[in-house]
Design a protein with these regions (language model features):
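Bacterial signal peptide processing site
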Residues: 26-28
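Extracytoplasmic small-molecule ligand-binding "clamshell" domains
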Residues: 70-74, 185-266
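C-terminal motif of bacterial Sec signal peptides marking the signal peptidase cleavage site
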Residues: 21-24
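Transmembrane alpha-helix signature in integral membrane proteins
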Residues: 321-340
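Acidic, polar ligand-binding/catalytic clefts
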Residues: 30-41, 52, 106-117, 127, ...
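Periplasmic-binding protein-like
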Residues: 96, 100-140, 160-178, 209, ...
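Immediate post-signal peptide segment of exported/extracytoplasmic ligand-binding proteins
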Residues: 31-46, 167-221, 298-299
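Ligand-binding clefts/hinges and TM-proximal coupling segments of bilobed small-molecule sensing domains
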Residues: 56-63, 67, 71, 111, ...
Length: 340
């Protein structure tokens, strides 16, 4: 009898505790209530960025001015978006293409019309692999001249196609009847040339597959603009391509250490990065934008699904630790209250 009463009470206590914790999610938001309408409003704002990106570097320069601007850094862009939806930050600075991808699934998000900064993406290569850099530059020039890169970018951005380029098989035939253009009359590098450079039989590209539409997962496979560009480069050079997913901050280090041959992950050339790594010619021009939440934090929180809300607030925010501690104390008190 006592055991059944204790069991029922424990279950009830657990359910109540979880519900209270989940319902409190979002209530610990910071004072991120600044109205964001233009670039000038970044002064004194709480800015969210993905750690190690160009956006991080640009926002950090604003933070250094000492005018109250604060930068919150996240391992993934999606984490920064979640913070924006919950009202924990005033805005997020990121590239326009991924900003539009986030906006498609979060209608309350708004991209301010004013450009925050303009930049270009390039592929990073170890400084002692000058011949590989020249070969990739050769491929980029061909792909630009043939309109292949423009086609890849447009098909992703305008038509929302996850795979806009179909690489050739080892037999030299297309895997499907894709309508995307393919390079022709290209000077092949071949696996033998790769081996002479001390590289593997395939060209290994490091990326960070959390940056839609440039690189992300769909149905368990890494897809996106950068993946298609990498495969097209492989076709020009006559080599197979391997895509390696890793944290963004690890890409340059991995290329330096030879764990990857090149890095393609929406990487902007900066003087700081050029101290440690080499860069190819640019293959895409982009602009940095400011993204804000046009609705209030409560409305965005209400739109969040139960499972997502449970994970972000109960697991990611470590609230389960408080619940377990409190539940343990409650059970001890309850146990002695019942038996006495």
């Amino acid at each position: 009898m006592i055991y059944n009463r204790l069991k029922r009470f424990s279950l009830s206590t657990l359910v109540i505790a979880v519900c209270l914790l989940i319902s409190s999610c979002g209530s610990d938001s910071s004072d991120a209530k600044k109205q964001m309408k233009a670039k000038a409003d970044l002064q004194g704002a709480v800015i969210g960025v993905q750690l190690g990106t160009t956006s991080d570097g640009l926002a950090t320069e604003l933070e250094k001015k000492g005018d109250g601007t604060k930068v919150e850094r996240y391992n993934k862009g999606a984490d920064a978006i979640q913070a924006l939806l919950q009202g924990k930050i005033d805005c997020m600075v990121t590239d326009e293409a991924p900003a539009k991808a986030f906006q498609r699934v979060n209608p309350s998000l708004q991209i301010l019309p004013e450009t925050f900064d303009a930049s270009s993406f390039a592929i990073c290569v170890a400084k002692d692999h000058g011949e590989l850099k020249q070969s990739i530059n050769h491929a980029i020039r061909i792909l630009k001249a043939n309109g292949v890169i423009d086609s890849i970018v447009n098909r992703h951005l305008e038509r929302g196609i996850a795979v806009a380029y179909t690489p050739k098989t080892s037999a030299g035939k297309l895997n499907s009847s894709s309508d995307a253009p393919h390079p022709s009359d290209a000077k092949k590098m071949g696996p033998e040339a790769l081996q002479k450079l001390g590289l593997k039989k395939s060209l290994r590209f490091a990326t960070n597959a959390t940056f839609e539409p440039f690189e992300y997962y769909q149905n368990g496979k890494i897809v996106g603009i950068d993946v298609d560009v990498a495969n097209a480069i492989g076709d020009v050079l006559g080599v197979d391509v391997e895509i390696l997913d890793m944290e963004f901050d690890a890409i340059i280090t991995s290329v330096q250490a030879g764990k990857a041959d090149a890095g393609i992950a929406g990487i902007t050339v900066t003087p700081e990065r050029e101290k440690n790594i080499g860069f190819t010619d640019s293959y895409a021009d982009v602009r940095q934008v400011i993204m804000v939440n046009s609705g209030d934090a409560k409305a965005a929180d209400a739109q969040q699904g139960f499972v997502d809300k449970f994970k972000s607030c109960f697991i990611d925010d470590n609230r389960y630790q408080y619940m377990l501690q409190g539940l343990g104390n409650t059970l001890i008190i309850t146990f002695f209250a019942i038996i006495l």
